[in-house]
Amino acid sequence: MSGNSIGKLFSVTSFGESHGPAIGCIVDGCPPGLTLSVEDIQQELDRRKPGTSRHVTQRREADRVEILSGVFENTTTGTPIALLIRNEDQRSKDYSKIMDVFRPGHADYTYWQKYGIRDYRGGGRSSARETAVRVAAGAIARKWLQQRYGIVIRGYMAQLGSIAIPFKSWDVVNQNPFFVADNDYVQKLETFMDSLRKSGNSAGARINVVAEGVPVGWGEPVYDRLDADIAYAMMSINAVKGVEIGAGFNSITQKGTEHSDEITPEGFLSNNAGGILGGISSGQPVVVSVAIKPTSSIRLARRSIDKAGNPVLVETHGRHDPCVGIRATPIVEAMLAIVLMDHALRHRAQNADVVCSTPRIPGSTTNQIHPVEMQASAPRAEDPEPDESS
């Protein structure tokens, strides 16, 4: 199997399966001299780990990270950093009934057709268990970006099922199990999830993530655009089915006078572009949104086939997240950090000596992390009526 790595100068290669002895990754390209401890990584893993509330899988994994190489006396050496997380609470017997059938919505059928063999225990390599090591690698990137450039990466759940959650404050995001930015919605979400769990069904979610402090100039047109690499990274996360940058699909209904972010000496008036123009960071906050599908592992019977092609009904038992989006915020943050660090190093390698005579305008103003809200508040010229004769 190929395709287990991401990044060019800052690269992450993951390995391991859901019910194997361990999962891990090799982080290559981290510059030397970064102060890094187990605690720096563990605090991010603890935000993602399972069993933290009744609304997520009850698989009990401590997700204790081990640093095997690349760090000496709590300082990165510039050599590959090997990270390991041991699996401690597998229940492979829960999956014995599906070893010869294909679960609808899962990678069972496609893995079997491609490789002629599959690890059916917990999804094997296709399990979201693999995302733990992404969070571990992302913790390294986050710390380097923060120390080197002052970049802050934060995410929150913006929608759970049909419930849209408004943004109220970053301060409350880590104070509730849903990573929502409005604590007034927590009880409503609790009730929704309790009902969902009892029904045996699942739900999707929308996660927004913002990187503030990203300098102007990062991104490698044409095929390695910053937004293209971000979308690539986000789509590699299990269950992600859509990615938006800035205004995203709302751009369809906007007019040019509304979507194009006007520029003044004091800064941009809006951020519909999501902080990226022509594939290059503009100095504004980088704004990304991802859509996460409902969990495919549900207790309700679904039609499928077995290995012989015979029709069967599949009921998935075991410990599963009724909404994988609940634990997805740290994962989405991590993938954005990995992409940004890779592009930071690439920009530094090729363009560090570039001097531009045009002053860099301020990149961050009020509400630019919420482009839709900014559209309503930004001063704009009146849109002309369309010319019916044209």
Swiss-Prot record:
InterPro entries: Chorismate_synth (IPR000453), Chorismate_synth_AroC_sf (IPR035904), Chorismate_synthase_CS (IPR020541)
A GO cellular component annotation in the UniProt record: cytosol
GO molecular-function terms, A-Z: chorismate synthase activity; FMN binding
Cofactor note: Reduced FMN (FMNH(2)).
Alphabetical list of SUPFAM superfamilies matching this protein: Chorismate synthase, AroC (SSF103263)
Amino acids binding NADP(+): 48, 54
Binding, FMN: 125-127, 238-239, 278, 293-297, 319
Cofactor dependence: FMNH2
Annotated stretches, region: Disordered: 359-390
EC number from the UniProt entry: 4.2.3.5
PROSITE patterns the UniProt entry points to: CHORISMATE_SYNTHASE_1, CHORISMATE_SYNTHASE_2, CHORISMATE_SYNTHASE_3
Catalysed reactions, as listed in the record: 5-O-(1-carboxyvinyl)-3-phosphoshikimate = chorismate + phosphate
The entry's keywords: Amino-acid biosynthesis, Aromatic amino acid biosynthesis, FAD, Flavoprotein, FMN, Lyase, NADP
Annotated metabolic or biological route of this protein: Metabolic intermediate biosynthesis; chorismate biosynthesis; chorismate from D-erythrose 4-phosphate and phosphoenolpyruvate: step 7/7
The UniProt record lists the keyword Lyase: yes
CDD domains: Chorismate_synthase
GO BP annotations listed: amino acid biosynthetic process; aromatic amino acid family biosynthetic process; chorismate biosynthetic process
Function comment: This reaction introduces a second double bond into the aromatic ring system.
HAMAP family for this protein: Chorismate_synth
Family membership: Belongs to the chorismate synthase family.
Assembly and interaction partners: Homotetramer.
Descriptive protein name: Chorismate synthase
Underlying gene: aroC
